[in-house]
Structures are given as structure tokens and as C-alpha cells.
């Protein structure tokens, strides 16, 4: 399903938000979500489990790097990133997680300087045999552990900015969206993928009590931040039934745009 694009002339004016939209939370609530996220991935990446994966690799039953967090799912729905140029000078993925989407975007492409940014990198870089940890060890990626709200990079710097499955984990989604817009170079690409929440979704106890995802956004809010500045190359909103978690999210936002 594709929804119409509402227009806006001011990405800084967050007005008339529906009560199901939660764009910022207290710092302690965000830290609670971060602890939950870190504990989740540490449990997934236990040493014995990774050792078993390495054995499978040696006998030819798996590829070199291990781990995936719906990254292939997002890639399929974002047209396998066919709109991304074959050569990118500077690229960054915010909220890259332990497995990253850049690992798929970089396939068949040359990225001169690839940055992976996540406040939990001190955990993720200790995981063995992931694309992120292996690429960092070989000095193929640069890393940054600032919260996205405190992004240290220069304005208009990146040719490619990736923000997939991130906003529901942050402290202040408005600040994060402004940072994504700010650091994208004129003519550069911004890719956004995000689960969406409605009033109907938020009425569910299991959604309201979700520790790891304190932020809730809808497609109108994302359009308000992105549409004034970016020319859409890809714009889709998947229906509830086509999303990853149909019981919790009314849709999935898919966007790629060139900064004007």
C-alpha cells in the first residue's frame, strides 16, 4: 500500500502530533532501552554459539561473516539498493547494530570511507566473525559511538546516509532526523526504513510495555522531516500485513531521497 505524501515547509516545526507519536523520552528511559538492546545481542552472540558457526563455515555450510538482523529483509524491500551509485566517497550508517546494512549495500560497490555509528559499539565490536567486527579489525570501516543526537560529523559531508530500523531506539527522534538531514551532502542519498505505530497499535499492552523501543513514529511525521529537503527516489509504505511485525505496526516506511 502506498500513502499520499503530505507536504510541509518546516522540518523543525513538530506540530499537531497524534498522541501515539512519541518523539523523545527521558534519558533514563533511553538508557533502559539501550541496556535491553545490549543484553539481547550479547545473548545472541555467546562464544559457544559463534564457535559452532565457525565450524559450519569450515565445512562449507555458511559464508564467512555471521549474523543478520532483518538486513536482507530490508534490502529486498528497498530494491536491493539498486539506486545507490557504484562508487561512494563517504557513507555512514547510523544505529548500525551488530550486523549493519552497509555490509549488503557495499556488495559490488566501492565505498572509499565507510562509517558505522552506534552508541553500543563497545559491545558489538567484541562479537567475533561479524562483518562489522571483522571489517573494523582489518581497518575497512571507521566507527563512531556517539548517540546520533550528538553526531560529531560536519554538515553536508556524506554522500550516503543510512537510517534503517533505528528511530524507535533513540533518545530524541526529532534530533536524529535533523542530524541525518544535516550531514547528507547536497545531491547525496538518505535511506530510511522504519516500522510505524498508530493509535490502534499503541493500545496493545505488549506494544506499550516494549522496553527496547521507546520511540513511536508514524509516516506523517517522517514525511514532515524528509519531504521538504529530499527528492524521493523511492517512497513506499508497506501495509500492516506486509511488515515484519503486523501485530505491532500498521505499516513500514521505505524512503530513499536525494538532498536538494
Q: Where would I find each of the regions flagged by the language model?
A:
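Short alpha-helix
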Residues: 212-230, 234
Amino acid at each position: 500500500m502506498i500513502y499520499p505524501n503530505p507536504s510541509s515547509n518546516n522540518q523543525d516545526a513538530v506540530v499537531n502530533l497524534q498522541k501515539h507519536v512519541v518523539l523523545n523520552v527521558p534519558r533514563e528511559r533511553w538508557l533502559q532501552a539501550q541496556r535491553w538492546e545490549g543484553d539481547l545481542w550479547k545473548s545472541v552472540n555467546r562464544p559457544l554459539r559463534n564457535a559452532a558457526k565457525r565450524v559450519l563455515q569450515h565445512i562449507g555450510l555458511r559464508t564467512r561473516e555471521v549474523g543478520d538482523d532483518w538486513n536482507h529483509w530490508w534490502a529486498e524491500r528497498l530494491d536491493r539498493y539498486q539506486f545507490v551509485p557504484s562508487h561512494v566517497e563517504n557513507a555512514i550508517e547510523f544505529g548500525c547494530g551488530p550486523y549493519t546494512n552497509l555490509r549488503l549495500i557495499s556488495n559490488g560497490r566501492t565505498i572509499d570511507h565507510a562509517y558505522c555509528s552506534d552508541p553500543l559499539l563497545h559491545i558489538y565490536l567484541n562479537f567475533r566473525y561479524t562483518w562489522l567486527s571483522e571489517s573494523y579489525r582489518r581497518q575497512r570501516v571507521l566507527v563512531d559511538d556517539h548517540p546520533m543526537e550528538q553526531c560529531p560529523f560536519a554538515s553536508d559531508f556524506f554522500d550516503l546516509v543510512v537510517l534503517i530500523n533505528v528511530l524507535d531506539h533513540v533518545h530524541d527522534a526529532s534530533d536524529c532526523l535533523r542530524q541525518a538531514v544535516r550531514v547528507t551532502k547536497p545531491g547525496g542519498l538518505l535511506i530510511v526504513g522504519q516500522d510505524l505505530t498508530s493509535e490502534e497499535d499503541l493500545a496493545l499492552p505488549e506494544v506499550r510495555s516494549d522496553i527496547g523501543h521507546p520511540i513511536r513514529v508514524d509516516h506523517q511525521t517522517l514525511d514532515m522531516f524528509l519531504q521538504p529537503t529530499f527528492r524521493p527516489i523511492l517512497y513506499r509504505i508497506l501495509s500492516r500485513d506486509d511488515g515484519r511485525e503486523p501485530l505491532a505496526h500498521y505499516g513500514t516506511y521505505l524512503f530513499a531521497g536525494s538532498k536538494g
